[in-house]
Amino acid sequence: MKNLLKNQIESHIEFSEWYRKIVNDFSFDLQKDREARDVLSRILEKKQYSYNLEEILLSFKENFQKKEHICVFGCGPSLEESVDFILSNLGKNFFNNCVNLAADGAAQLLNERIIPIDGIITDLDGITKRDFLKAKYVIVHAHGDNIILLEHFKNTIINFTKIIGTTQAESTQYLINPGGFTDGDRILTFIVSFLLPQQELYLIGMDFNDIVGKYSKPNNEKNYLADPIKLKKLQYALQIIEWLIPKIKIPLYLINTKKISDKFNYLTLEAFKERF
């Protein structure tokens, strides 16, 4: 049974070709990715109890499969309007009855609205330690540009029980490589092998346009225009999710966003409300 779920997640999709393309396109340093992986791995080794990745993955899977509706929250400009509309029309119990997964800074809004967070998927640049501690599970990603943040969150990571480390380099005993590039699409590559036929996926605040939502970074007061690098990252995220569609095999809906691809189902906020 050792590493059964780790192997399941890592083998469910073949992401290496995507990774090579991304590294070449952005001129990323492979060695820095490995260095970040090793930093996070050493931090996880310092946990005072015996850290068992497989047990935490099993716990996450069991929690994830208890509910029919899965809400994945991105940091796009439609996030706040969408969440507030759902709260006003369907009430907080709607979110209480969903699996709520936040891409990085989207956790800020969910915490402000006192919405339970089942998991944050984060490279740590969009959340505070307070956001970190409010989630049931935290999936921390190590890459070449966040080594300083890994050190900043070191004690928080050590003291947090239900934590899963991810890397885009070769995996280790303590870290998993689920594929994915941005926090938003990495949520889907991470959960795709856990999905059940009766479940449905709702992507909220995932707009993939040239406006970046204010919740993408702590202390932002308003949305802002994406720079060329950010825009290219969002386009990759969109392409990766499109590529995942045949592997997801359950209904997936983008909520309250403009049509960006023929491969997705779209729901206005009113249409979303009518489903429930």
Descriptions of predicted regions:
Residues 72-77, 183-184, 198-215, 229, ...:
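Glycine-rich anion-binding loop/nest that anchors nucleotide
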Residues 62-67, 98-99, 105-198:
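Acidic/Gly/His-enriched mid-domain segments of enzyme catalytic cores or analogous surface patches
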Residues 74, 81-86, 111-114, 214-215:
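Short, glycine/acidic-enriched capping/hinge loops at junctions between secondary-structure elements
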Residues 87-88, 147-150, 184-185, 228-239:
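Well-ordered, non-membrane alpha-helical segments in soluble/globular domains
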Residues 85-94, 115-117, 154-157, 218-221, ...:
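Short, solvent-exposed amphipathic alpha-helical segments in soluble enzyme
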Residues 1-70, 75-84, 220-223, 234-276:
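N-terminal donor/sugar-recognition subdomains of glycan-related enzymes
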Residues 70-71, 92-100:
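Short beta-strand/loop segments at the ligand-binding rim of alpha/beta enzyme cores
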